[in-house]
């Protein structure tokens, strides 16, 4: 037989199985909360974390503000003091220092 090994894990959600759409939705929500929480701890203001979707490769500068219903994906970089207004979709793009983007804009690099 094969050897079975237990691996300690602080958060069971990091290793949960995904066997259907319900589990997939729960895992996506967990990752959204985890990413948003980390950025808020680093000083990014996210007015509505439930409607801000930030991909794992997105980076932020200092004192960035993210409004509700925003989508930031790919290798997007948001520099210091920028503000992302509601309804904005950014993918593989750069937001310059103190730039205000949106509302209701889609920008792809």
Predicted regions and their residues:
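Left-handed beta-helix
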Residues: 2-109
